[in-house]
Swiss-Prot record:
UniProt cross-references to InterPro entries, sorted A to Z: Gas-vesicle_GvpA-like, Gas_vesicle_GvpA, GvpA, GvpA-like_CS
Main location, first listed in the record: other
One term under GO cellular component: gas vesicle shell
Species: Koribacter versatilis (strain Ellin345)
Gene: gvpA
Protein name, UniProt field: Gas vesicle protein A
Length: 98
């Protein structure tokens, strides 16, 4: 007698895709004490999400205010001409944002 598997479940790739798309947060707080004296206290918050999902929800709750985010503008470099009394030379290009 052969055993048949039902393929109605989710594969690992489907689960990972959903977790990265929606994101999950694991919030843990553990305290170990002996006779009323705290020996170890552990507080942890683990966020599992894609970068886009994290930034979208972190902006909504104001968590990205402390982090410097790079500007997503195009940088155009133009040469700067520096004129000296006796010679003329080209300095390093400066960076100008559009």
């Amino acid at each position: 007698m052969a055993v048949e598997r039902v393929s109605g479940g989710s594969s690992l790739i489907d689960v990972l895709d959903r977790v990265l798309d929606k994101g999950i947060v694991i919030d843990a707080w553990v305290r170990i004490s002996l006779v009323g004296i705290d020996l170890i206290t552990v507080e942890a918050r683990v966020v599992v999400a894609s970068i886009d999902t994290y930034l979208k929800y972190a902006d909504a709750v104001g968590l990205t205010g402390l982090v410097s985010r790079p500007q997503l503008t195009e940088v155009v470099e133009e040469p700067v001409v520096v004129e000296a009394p006796a010679t003329r030379r080209t300095a390093r290009p400066s960076r100008r944002r559009i």
